[in-house]
Amino acid sequence: MKVCNMQKGTLPVSRHHAYDGVVIKRIEKELCKTIKDRDTESKKKAICVIKEATKKAESLRIDAVCDGYQIGIQTAFEHIIDYICEWKLKQNENRRNIEDYITSLLSENLHDERIISTLLEQWLSSLRNTVTELKVVLPKCNLALRKKLELDLHKYRSDVKIILKYSEGNNYIFCSGNQVVEFSPQDVISGVKIELAEKLTKNDKKYFKELAHKKLRQIAEDLLKENPVND
């Protein structure tokens, strides 16, 4: 039997491989694998970079929101300060109007002939009945009071002689011997205005404190709604 040399009838081992009917050299295959691996690695790195960038962007966004919130709070306080100034100016204007009204009202009433007549009668009743002469100094702004006083005193103490004088001031002065009393409508008005100012100041401070806190809370809530910060 003749032994055939199989090696002679066999093609040498090729370094080529067939993929889908296309012969590809091994080196080309390895190159393709390397490219694929590098592509995969590049994608992984790209994903990491994107994630890191996204994370950083989110951090920056949160920082921006926080910064915006702080700026918002600062702006809110500036608005509050402006509000305080405007409010105080308005309150001062209102207070002046109230004080002017009270001054006008009291000035009319405190110069009323019935009040002066009553004061004079009460003062006379506190003196001894030996009073025979009475000096009364009236402000020129109330000349019309003379006849009223003369009539009232004649009814009350017909035995007392009245000497009337006038002054440029606003006070009423009653004299009998060494006894002197002075009635100042302006002092009464000033006292009432001081008492009123104290009450208004106390109420204003309480009212403003409550209102300011309410406005600050509202501004903070509005800022949080506009700039939500996710943990």
Swiss-Prot record:
| GO terms, biological process | protein transport
Gene Ontology terms: cellular component: cytoplasm
Which keywords does this Swiss-Prot/TrEMBL entry list? Cytoplasm, Plasmid, Protein transport, Transport, Virulence
Main localization of the protein?
Answer: cytoplasm
Phenotype on disruption: Inactivation of the gene abolishes the ability of bacteria to assemble a complete type III secretion apparatus (T3SA) and therefore to secrete the translocon proteins IpaB/SctE and IpaC/SctB, and decreases the amounts of the needle filament proteins MxiH/SctF and MxiI/SctI. Mutant is unable to invade HeLa cells.
Reading the lineage from the top rank, the first entry is Bacteria
**Could you tell me where this protein is found in the cell?**
Cytoplasm
Functional description taken from the UniProt entry? Component of the type III secretion system (T3SS), also called injectisome, which is used to inject bacterial effector proteins into eukaryotic host cells. Acts as a regulator of the Spa47/SctN ATPase activity. It down-regulates the ATPase activity of the oligomeric Spa47/SctN, while it up-regulates the activity of the monomeric form. Important for translocation of MxiH/SctF, the major needle component.
The record's subunit annotation is: The core secretion machinery of the T3SS is composed of approximately 20 different proteins, including cytoplasmic components, a base, an export apparatus and a needle. This subunit is part of the cytosolic complex. Interacts directly with Spa47/SctN (T3SS ATPase) and Spa33/SctQ (the major sorting platform component). Homodimer in solution.
Name of the molecule in the record: Type 3 secretion system stator protein
Q: Which organism is it from?
A: Shigella flexneri
